[in-house]
Each structure stands twice: as structure tokens, then as C-alpha cells.
């Protein structure tokens, strides 16, 4: 075996591409490494197309092996299971920029598998996987119009940083991944700490310029190690069939696309489609339904795109920069902690915020170890939202991706745990959908968080932009419909505050998207975002002053770290009895910070009082109220504060001589005692002598009524 290796410098890292030694039965296989992070990527492409295949079956799988980090998986089976949310998101990250680079009409099945086999904790494997997938496709010989490059851009001390390490990323105000060809950007995924539109665009341009090194290296690698290009040509257009479909459907489709209501429009389009299929197949039974539908869809695209480029009204009658009608309601669910319904045209999100304690935080078992997430965001897209029936179950890739985008949009304005000691979960239920439900989720989440009294730094709104481009003629669309997304050339989503951008996601289906077009889209998105924020601020101008009556109240107190074991008790018995008896939740940090959560304020005060008693120190000369726990011939043991116990010697029970302890004291009896001495071993000597004559008076002078409380002398 003589592997072929290509090595090049990429920013501060060294990238190595190797092929020819492993997985030689795959169509192509590449071991891509960036320093010590290695991802093994394979491509298998079928030479034959399944009969009746009318779509491109591309599958991208990304999987992390725990051995890559020198770990053994947890759980009973001790092996990796179904893909995690993080793995699903990275699979989407690989898929999005490569899918548009396969030619129209190419329906051969392709599977890409990226396996993380070694990981340096400072270098994320996602970028390495993208580079490896691009290289493997370039070697495979399939009709792939790549290669693509990929770059991560950080923003530290007002400077762009190429492929920052994990430690550098913690100081960065930006996490942006950009992928594209040598000519154009194809995909952007980012999260930002409220940067300007100009800074975001500059980051995209910077990343695209830097990744040219990767593209050139992969071209050289493919020239040396690549397989012969497949002899594939796109099937010739059936002009007779195209004209036939056009003659039946064009005018009727034109009228249908003037129906502004989505369901009514779809019903009319379905009728036209069924009529076309019936008429065409009646004349020639050999023509497949799939081919007719492809031509029908292309005709729909021509009609919609042509109208937009000619400056005619859009499908729903709007101009290119008009945002659909907005409707906002907050506090819609009485027993939840915060809720809002955000409606934009025919897209609607019900967002609900829930506050929890630190024990509600999500523990994520990542490749390099466990991570705790205190802000959870879940996006649900039920079939009824588009008027369909379907399966209900675990979230699909799309739901996971949309939820993460919405979370990125809101994360920058969330308070820190020290500012607001709650774990926060937001759920966005999409109840209607006709374009940009993820951005509706951002708006709904912002409203629900404010309704819940979460002190977010500013309101956040999101907007989806579209593009229709033919040669040098282009139109940027604000607040796109589902059809405009499907038939357009770009899906460009921007979330942010009045001050700047918090998240940017871009997927482009064509080449030739210039920085000028992106700048126009960003400016138009800013204008739309300001309009939406204005309406949101009218509904709820600031976070509620107080949290919901149904949300847990979290109170904090400090104890001596040495006393933590006393509060917890043997095997957790003490803290468990506190929580069970009061209905509270108690979390104790190593520094002695105690967080007590409960809906009932009185329960919290009771717990705080009991913890103060448990952790209190017994002092010499102080008088306490205690309870007799044991009797002995030589005296009585009395429970004091802080789980401490002292001895009242028989000679210290009364002024007169005591012959028998049980004549004066009984187990469970409350008594007033004074601390005489605490010896080196911590043993406490008590006396009742001076206090025995006037126990009643001392009881009236109690500072606190609880067992073990000190009293005034």
C-alpha cells in the first residue's frame, strides 16, 4: 500500500489529506487531519439509478467514536448509540454546501460517512469533516462541481481569527463557519455577540478568501489521486412534453399563483397538476408521473420567478421588502411561567418559557467530556402546521437544526447564571407554517422570555430573506413564503437586536452571489428586523418585573464550606429530609453557596432557618434551648444547634444534690442550658444550674423558637 498524502498549512494549523491505505473498496476514502484531530471520510456512489428515481438520494452521516478521545462510552451497552444532537447538526453542516454542487438530473445514490477517529480537544472535528468530505467527493469521480473549502472565523479583540482553537473561541464574539467554492459562498452558519451587519459580512468575505488555500490543495490532491470523471451527461430535455405541460397548465398556474391564501392556492395547484397528469398519460402511458411533476414544478418556478424579476407583486401581493402582517399575544397560557403567540402572515409560533433549578440543566456527554447547558431550546414542527397528517415522534434533523438556529439567535441576550440563577427552557410549537418558522421561533422566544420575567439584555427578532437571480438581474425578498424559499436561489436568515446581529444562516443554491448582493440582503433584513422589533416592543416593552407565581423562587445563602457535610448528612439523609418535609429543592456548591428553590416562600424561609441551625457554631457562655436526647447515670445529653450534642453532668442539673437524673429530666424534654466548656476533642459541657430556677423566664426570652436556638441571658 502506497498512500498518497497532501499536506498544507491552514492558518495556525497543519492539514493532512491521505488516501489509498484504508477502505479501498469505497468509491473514495480520505483521512483528513488538522493537527491531532482526524476524521475518516468515505464516499460510496452507485453507478446505476433505481428505476423510477426522481430525486437525488444523498445521505450524509457524521459519527463520533469515543475512542478518538481515549474514552469508553457510558451506559449499559458501553458502545455508541443513535446520533446525538451535535452529530446531527454537523451532518447537516457537511450536507448543506455540497448538495447544490451536484448537477440537476443526477439521481445516483451517494452516501458520505464521516467518522471521527482522533480528537485534539482544542480543534473541533466539524471543519475537518467538511474538508474531508470535499476531498473524498473530488477523488470519487462523481459529477461534483467542487471542491469546496470551509473555514471557521472568530472575532477576538476586534480582529478576525481563522480557525480559532477551543480556548480562543471562548474569548471570541463570533463563531462563524463559511463554506464555498473558489468562486462563491454557498453556506454560512454563525452565532454572534451582537455584531454589526458590516462586521458579519466582512467575516464571511474573510473566511471565503482564506479557504481558497483548502480548495487549491484539494484540486492538487485530486489531480494526483483522483479517479476518472464519470461519463455522465444530463438527460436531454423532452421539449415535446415540456410544451405539452406548458400548454395545459401555464395560464391556469398563473391564475393560481395570484391566490394569496396558501391552502386555497395549494388546492388549485393540486387540481391543475392532477389534470395535467391525466391528460398527458392518456396520450402516452409510457411517460412517468415523476417526469411530468418535474416539468410542472419547473413551470411553477418560471412563473413565480419571472413575475418577481419583472417587478410584479409577489405570490401574496406584497412588494419585495414588505413584511407580512404581525400579530402578538403574551401571557396566553395561565399556568406556564411565560408564553407568547407570534404570528407573521400564515406562519405562527407558540413559544413557552419554563424556569428551573440547576438540577434541571442538561448534561451533554460530548467527545471531550461532559458539558452542562443551562439554556435549552426545543423546536417542534407538527404535521398539522402545514395542514397535513403525519407521524409524531422524536425530532427529525430539520427540527434539531431549526431549534439550534433559533437558540443561537437568542443566546447572546440571555443573562448569566450569576445574574439569573435559573435554568431556562424555551419550547417553540409551530402551529402554522408558510415560510421562516425558525425566525418566528426567535421572535416568540424573545416574547416568552420577557413574559417569564427573564432579564434578557434586549428583544430579539428574526427574518428570512430570499433571492431570485437570473444572470445580472436579481431581486432580494424580505420575509419569504415557503414557495419563495423552495423556488428561489437563497435562504438567508438573520436574527438580532436593535444593536446588531446575533445569528446568521445562509444557504445558497447557485454560484455568483457577490458581497454586494449579501450586503443588500443584510441591509434589507435590518430594516425588516427593526419593523418587527417595533411591533414586539409595543406588545411587551421590557421583561416583567417579577417571575410567575407558578415558577420556583430561588434564594441563596452562604455557609462555611466545612459545614457542607453537616447539611448533607450521612448518605444525604439531612438534605433529603429537608427537601421532603418542605417541598423545596436544594443545591449546594463547593464554595458553600446554598440555592433553595420553591414556589412557596414560607417553605424557603423554613429551610433557611433550619440550615442556619445546622451550621451554627456552639459558643462558650451562650445560653441555648435544647432537647434531651439520652439519659445516663452520670447526666443527660442535650441536642443543640448544628447537630451538636452536649452533656449536662448530674452535678450541673440543679442547685440541690441530684440522686437520680430521671427524677429531673426526661427524653424529649426541652431545657435551657448554658455552655460551660468545649474541650479539644469538641466535647461540650453544659449546665442548667444557674437557669433551673427560672426556666419559664428564659423560654420567654428566646431569640428563636426552634430547637437549639440561642437565648438571651
UniProtKB/Swiss-Prot annotation:
Its cofactor is Mg(2+). Involved in mRNA degradation. Catalyzes the phosphorolysis of single-stranded polyribonucleotides processively in the 3'- to 5'-direction. GO terms for biological process: mRNA catabolic process; RNA processing. Its main location: cytoplasm. It is found in: Cytoplasm. This is Polyribonucleotide nucleotidyltransferase. Belongs to the polyribonucleotide nucleotidyltransferase family. The gene is pnp. One of its GO terms (molecular function) is magnesium ion binding. Mg(2+) binds at residues 485, 491. Component of the RNA degradosome, which is a multiprotein complex involved in RNA processing and mRNA degradation. InterPro entries: ExoRNase_PH_dom1, ExoRNase_PH_dom2, ExoRNase_PH_dom2_sf, KH_dom, KH_dom_type_1, KH_dom_type_1_sf, NA-bd_OB-fold, PNPase. Its EC number is 2.7.7.8. Residues 552-611 form the KH domain. Keywords: Cytoplasm, Magnesium, Metal-binding, Nucleotidyltransferase, RNA-binding, Transferase. Residues 701-713 have a biased composition (Polar residues). The lineage of its organism: Bacteria, Pseudomonadati, Pseudomonadota, Gammaproteobacteria, Pasteurellales. Residues 694-713 are annotated as: Disordered. SMART domains: KH (SM00322), S1 (SM00316). It is an enzyme of class 2 (transferase). One of its GO terms (cellular component) is cytosol. The keyword Cytoplasm applies. Residues 621-689 form the S1 motif domain.
Amino acid at each position: 500500500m502506497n498512500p498518497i498524502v497532501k499536506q498544507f498549512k491552514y492558518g495556525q494549523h497543519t492539514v493532512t489529506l491521505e488516501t489509498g491505505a484504508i477502505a479501498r473498496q469505497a468509491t473514495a476514502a480520505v483521512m483528513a487531519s488538522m493537527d491531532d484531530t482526524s476524521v475518516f471520510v468515505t464516499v460510496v456512489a452507485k453507478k446505476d439509478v433505481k428505476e423510477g428515481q426522481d430525486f437525488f438520494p444523498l445521505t450524509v452521516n457524521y459519527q463520533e467514536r469515543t475512542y478518538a478521545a481515549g474514552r469508553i462510552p457510558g451506559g449499559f451497552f458501553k458502545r455508541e448509540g443513535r446520533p446525538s444532537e451535535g452529530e446531527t447538526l454537523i451532518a447537516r453542516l457537511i450536507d448543506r454546501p455540497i448538495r447544490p454542487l451536484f448537477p440537476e438530473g443526477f439521481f445516483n445514490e451517494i452516501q458520505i460517512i464521516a467518522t471521527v477517529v482522533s480528537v485534539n480537544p482544542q480543534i473541533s472535528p466539524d471543519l475537518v469533516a467538511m474538508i474531508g468530505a470535499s476531498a473524498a467527493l473530488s477523488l470519487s469521480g462523481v459529477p461534483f462541481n467542487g471542491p469546496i473549502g470551509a473555514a471557521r472565523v472568530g472575532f477576538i479583540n476586534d480582529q478576525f481569527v481563522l480557525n480559532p482553537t477551543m480556548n480562543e473561541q471562548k474569548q471570541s464574539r463570533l463563531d462563524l463557519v463559511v463554506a464555498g467554492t473558489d468562486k462563491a459562498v454557498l453556506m454560512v452558519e454563525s452565532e454572534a455577540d451582537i455584531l454589526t451587519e458590516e462586521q458579519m459580512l466582512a467575516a464571511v468575505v474573510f473566511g471565503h478568501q482564506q479557504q481558497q488555500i483548502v480548495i487549491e490543495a484539494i484540486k492538487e490532491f485530486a489531480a494526483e489521486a483522483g479517479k476518472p470523471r464519470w461519463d455522465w451527461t444530463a438527460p436531454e430535455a423532452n421539449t415535446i412534453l415540456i410544451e405539452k405541460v406548458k400548454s395545459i397548465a401555464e395560464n391556469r398556474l398563473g391564475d393560481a399563483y395570484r391566490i394569496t391564501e396558501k391552502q386555497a392556492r395549494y388546492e388549485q395547484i393540486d387540481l391543475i397538476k392532477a389534470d395535467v397528469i391525466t391528460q398527458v398519460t392518456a396520450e402516452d402511458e409510457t411517460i412517468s408521473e415523476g417526469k411530468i411533476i418535474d416539468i410542472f414544478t419547473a413551470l411553477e418556478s418560471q412563473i413565480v420567478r419571472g413575475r418577481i424579476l419583472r417587478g410584479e407583486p409577489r405570490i401574496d401581493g406584497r412588494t419585495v421588502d414588505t413584511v407580512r402582517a404581525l400579530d402578538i399575544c403574551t401571557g396566553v397560557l395561565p399556568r406556564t411561567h411565560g408564553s407568547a403567540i407570534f404570528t407573521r402572515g400564515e406562519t405562527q409560533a407558540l413559544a413557552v418559557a419554563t424556569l428551573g433549578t440547576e438540577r434541571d440543566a442538561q448534561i451533554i456527554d460530548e467527545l471531550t467530556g461532559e458539558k452542562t447547558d443551562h439554556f435549552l431550546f426545543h423546536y417542534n414542527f407538527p404535521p398539522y402546521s402545514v395542514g397535513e397528517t403525519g407521524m409524531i415522534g422524536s425530532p427529525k434533523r430539520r427540527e434539531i437544526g431549526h431549534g439550534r438556529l433559533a437558540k443561537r439567535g437568542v443566546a447572546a441576550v440571555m443573562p448569566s447564571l450569576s445574574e439569573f440563577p435559573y435554568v431556562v427552557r424555551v419550547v417553540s410549537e409551530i402551529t402554522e407554517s408558510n415560510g421562516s418558522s425558525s425566525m418566528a421561533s426567535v421572535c416568540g422566544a424573545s416574547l416568552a422570555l420577557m413574559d417569564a420575567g427573564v432579564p434578557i439584555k434586549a428583544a430579539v427578532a428574526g427574518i428570512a430573506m430570499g433571492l431570485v437571480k437570473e444572470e445580472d438581474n436579481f431581486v432580494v425578498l424580505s420575509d419569504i413564503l415557503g414557495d419563495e424559499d423552495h423556488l428561489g436561489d437563497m435562504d438567508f436568515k438573520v436574527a438580532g437586536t436593535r444593536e446588531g446581529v446575533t445569528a446568521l444562516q445562509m444557504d445558497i443554491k447557485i454560484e455568483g452571489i457577490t458581497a454586494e448582493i449579501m450586503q443588500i440582503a443584510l441591509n434589507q433584513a435590518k430594516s425588516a428586523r427593526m419593523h418587527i422589533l417595533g411591533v414586539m416592543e409595543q406588545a411587551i416593552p421590557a421583561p416583567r418585573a417579577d417571575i410567575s407565581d407558578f415558577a420556583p423562587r430561588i434564594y441563596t445563602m452562604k455557609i462555611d464550606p466545612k459545614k457542607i457535610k453537616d447539611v448533607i448528612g450521612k448518605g444525604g439523609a439531612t438534605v433529603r429530609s429537608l427537601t421532603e418535609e418542605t417541598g423545596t429543592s436544594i443545591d449546594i456548591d463547593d464554595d458553600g453557596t446554598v440555592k433553595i428553590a420553591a414556589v412557596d416562600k414560607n417553605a424557603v424561609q423554613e429551610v433557611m432557618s433550619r440550615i442556619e441551625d445546622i451550621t451554627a457554631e456552639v459558643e462558650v457562655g451562650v445560653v441555648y434551648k435544647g432537647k434531651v436526647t439520652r439519659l445516663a447515670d452520670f447526666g443527660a445529653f442535650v441536642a443543640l444547634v448544628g447537630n451538636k450534642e452536649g452533656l449536662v453532668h448530674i452535678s450541673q442539673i440543679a442547685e440541690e444534690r441530684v440522686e437520680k437524673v430521671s427524677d429531673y429530666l426526661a427524653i424529649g424534654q426541652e431545657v435551657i442550658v448554658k455552655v460551660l466548656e468545649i474541650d479539644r476533642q469538641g466535647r461540650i459541657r453544659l449546665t442548667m444550674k444557674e437557669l433551673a430556677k427560672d426556666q419559664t423566664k428564659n423560654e420567654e426570652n428566646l431569640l428563636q423558637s426552634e430547637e437549639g436556638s440561642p437565648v438571651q441571658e
